[in-house]
Amino acid sequence: MVGTKRVADSIDTNSDDTLTRNREVEVEAMLSRRKQLRTTTTRTTTTRTTPLSLSSSASKMNWSKNDELVILGGIVDYENETKLSYRSDWDALYRYIKDCVEAKFSKIQLINKVKNMKRKFTYNQGRSNHGEQLSFTNTDDDEIFKLSLIIWDKNESEYVSNENIDQAKDVPSGEPETNDVPCEEQDDRDVPCEEQERANIEIDNGVREKLDQAKDVPCVEQESEDVPCVEQERVSIEIDNGEKEKLDQTMDCEEQENTDVLCEEKGDKDVPCEEQENKDVPCEEQERVSIEIDNGEEEMSSEEDGVDEVGVMEDTLDSGISFQGLGKNGVKDKSEEDDVVELGVLQEIFKEDTFFQSLGRYQQKLLLQNLENVGVERRKELINEWKALFVDEQRLCVKKLTFAAKLANLGVSP
């Protein structure tokens, strides 16, 4: 009995061991199959999802307001520097802007962003054209709209040109009239000849046009024949006691020389000159021209004696520039006209500066608008300072011309 029990017990233990081993093998096989399934599924999912995730992340770009301002400002500066449209070469525009933005982006993202900003601008522009008042919650949106206006508004250039034309109309043009008109005709306009000459000094773009000083240099042929140029002496520039240049004469020095020499060679004035016979012009007509010149000199001398009576033009003797226009239908209010003229002069002086010309169009427009906020007193101080600089420049030019005349005389007369 005992032997049978032991055999049965051994059989039971062997069967239990085999069962446990079979279970362990099955568990290991199951785990291995699960691992294989997981690896295959992860591989397929990664191969399928990776391009989508990359494409979606590449297409998405969170642009800030600062980035938009940098892009628009870069477009404005790029067009100013290259004189080309930004649409002509996207690669060049991308290279020009990419280093200015902190975030990394591609050329396609830049193109899409510019197109979106243009759509937004056209929408806002349409609202404003239909009479809706545009109001922005922050200053960044306002700056973005202004930059977009500079880039995409077709009428912007016309608006700026019209603004400049209006400012030029406010500034007295004062083109110098020809001196061929006698002083008697100018007296009919109730304007003295001396005052009319001073008032007709031209201010072109805020900087007074330099007078033709080359005619102040004595004519070489005239000096060789010892014939004084009457018209040249009449309109010669006086520098003593702070008096500045007057308007240049319209009669050419050489023509005056020829007419005076020809008339002096003929003792009998009734006999026509030899060269004037070819032109069918009698010598008497030449005499009338010289008489008119003498009358003009006498009237100028009499008007120079009465300069003190002209109170309005008293200050312009030192500066050589008149900032008051003579209106055709009456004179406007003096204070308002002076303010407009001074503002226009300051803006045009600033435009001629090399630093201003090196800036972009948007920065130039902002600086010109800021000049309008300058006070009246400060504006007058700047005008007076510019007058002093201009007078110094004119004196230097006169000295240079005088020195050139001396060199010319030395070269002619050994």
Curated annotation (Swiss-Prot):
Subunit and interaction comment: Homo- and heterodimers. Interacts with GEBP, GPL1 and GPL2. Interacts with GEBP.
Cellular compartments per GO CC: nucleus
Sequence similarity: Belongs to the GeBP family.
Location, primary (coarse class): nucleus
GO BP annotation list: regulation of DNA-templated transcription
Superkingdom to which the source organism belongs: Eukaryota
Organism encoding this protein: Arabidopsis thaliana
Low complexity composition-biased segments: 38-50
Keywords: Nucleus, Transcription, Transcription regulation
Chain residue ranges for the region called Non-canonical leucine-zipper: 382-403
Keyword Transcription: yes
Matching InterPro entries: GEBP, GeBP-like_DBD
Entry's localization field: Nucleus
Function per UniProt: Probable transcription factor. Involved in stress responses. Plays a repressive role in cell expansion by counteracting the positive role of CPR5 in this process, but does not regulate cell proliferation or endoreduplication.
Tissue specificity: Expressed in the apical meristem and young leaf primordia. Detected in the vascular tissues of rosette leaves, in primary and secondary roots and at the base of flowers and siliques.
Protein known as: GLABROUS1 enhancer-binding protein-like 3
Region named Disordered: 36-57, 167-191
